[in-house]
């Protein structure tokens, strides 16, 4: 399987289709009301329907933080195919959503401050399908533009696939992937003009950089 490429924080159906055209394997939707990239279930349904017609294999990821069952159900009904838990969800929370939504991919995101956080990440491998490592910020859950210490992550080899996030851009992606070998990458602020408004030139530059360095295989 090739590198998974998730572009997160979309709000516009045409941008979603254009980014899928460029080669994204997943589109992420922020279901956290405090986020400037927030989209309602109705907005997600509109984008999901458009993607289902043009790119049915592209994964549609709902990004949640300490969500209720009702919130998750609303976005699942809107057409998401993966649940990304990006808050302070515990192992018990993750197992509960695993049991409730067995057909959906379950991703647990962890905001990494130290190697102790990497050990915590590995503890989730029994109840989730995929891990995601993001940079820690005291006030923001994601989309901060801050990068991780890639060198410190080199020993991270969990038993589940993992995605690298945190301040990735078309300019630094090849450096990151020369040091690390995740199953996929997740970009948001590094390819946008403003929160929720993606810059298609930057997304194109991302794929060009990956292709030029033979990283799309």
UniProtKB/Swiss-Prot annotation:
Keyword terms, alphabetized: Amino-acid biosynthesis, Aromatic amino acid biosynthesis, Isomerase, Tryptophan biosynthesis
Catalytic activity: N-(5-phospho-beta-D-ribosyl)anthranilate = 1-(2-carboxyphenylamino)-1-deoxy-D-ribulose 5-phosphate
CDD domains: PRAI
Enzyme class per UniProt: isomerase
Pathway(s) annotated for this protein in UniProt: Amino-acid biosynthesis; L-tryptophan biosynthesis; L-tryptophan from chorismate: step 3/5
Pfam families hit by this protein: PRAI
Entry keyword annotation includes Nuclease: no
EC number: 5.3.1.24
Top-rank lineage group of the source organism: Bacteria
Thylakoid keyword on record: no
Gene Ontology molecular function: phosphoribosylanthranilate isomerase activity
GO terms, biological process: L-tryptophan biosynthetic process
NCBIfam families for this protein: PRK01222.1-4
Family: Belongs to the TrpF family.
Protein name (database record): N-(5'-phosphoribosyl)anthranilate isomerase
UniProt source species: Synechococcus sp. (strain ATCC 27144 / PCC 6301 / SAUG 1402/1)
Organism lineage string: Bacteria, Bacillati, Cyanobacteriota, Cyanophyceae, Synechococcales
């Amino acid at each position: 399987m090739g590198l998974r490429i998730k572009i997160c924080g979309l709000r516009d159906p045409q941008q979603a289709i254009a980014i899928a055209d460029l080669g994204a394997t997943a589109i992420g939707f922020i279901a956290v009301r405090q986020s400037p990239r927030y989209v309602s279930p109705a907005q997600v349904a509109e984008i999901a329907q458009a993607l289902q017609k043009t790119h049915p294999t592209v994964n549609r990821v709902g990004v949640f933080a300490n969500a209720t069952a009702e919130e998750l159900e609303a976005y699942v009904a809107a057409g998401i195919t993966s649940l990304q838990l990006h808050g302070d969800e515990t192992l018990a929370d993750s197992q509960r959503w695993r049991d409730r939504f067995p057909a959906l991919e379950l991703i647990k995101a962890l905001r990494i401050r130290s190697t102790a956080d990497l050990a915590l990440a590995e503890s989730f491998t029994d109840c989730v399908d995929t891990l995601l490592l993001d940079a820690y910020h005291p006030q923001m859950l994601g989309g901060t533009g801050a990068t991780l210490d890639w060198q410190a992550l080199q020993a991270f080899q969990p038993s589940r696939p993992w995605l690298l996030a945190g301040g990735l851009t078309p300019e630094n992606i090849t450096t990151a992937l020369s040091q690390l070998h995740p199953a996929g990458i997740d970009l948001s602020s590094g390819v946008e003009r403003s929160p929720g408004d993606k810059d298609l030139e930057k997304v194109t530059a991302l794929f060009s950089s990956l292709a030029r360095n033979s990283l799309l295989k």
